């Protein structure tokens, strides 16, 4: 399970996966509201990860464990 660092740049959210030296813009988040944040996350370029939903929108930057699952 890679550690993904999420950070905001202006109005965009970016994800950095150190193990792959990859940084990409987040284009979709399954849960992105005041009560819950996370779930299936789609990155620019087609990669998808799953982050266990957090209680509310986190303060960025934040490091979270993610799984890469081709079935999501």
UniProtKB/Swiss-Prot annotation:
A GO BP entry: nitrogen fixation
Pfam families assigned to the protein according to its UniProt record, in alphabetical order: NifT
Entry keywords, A to Z: Nitrogen fixation
Highest taxon in the source lineage: Bacteria
Identification of the protein by name: Protein NifT
Source organism (scientific name): Klebsiella pneumoniae
Gene responsible for this protein: nifT
């Amino acid at each position: 399970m890679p550690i993904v660092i999420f950070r905001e740049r202006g109005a965009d959210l970016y994800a950095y996966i150190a193990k792959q030296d990859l940084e990409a813009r987040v284009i979709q988040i399954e849960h992105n509201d005041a009560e819950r944040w996370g779930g299936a996350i789609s990155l620019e370029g087609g990669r998808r990860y799953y982050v266990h939903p957090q209680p509310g929108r986190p303060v960025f930057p934040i490091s979270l464990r993610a799984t890469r699952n081709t079935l999501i």
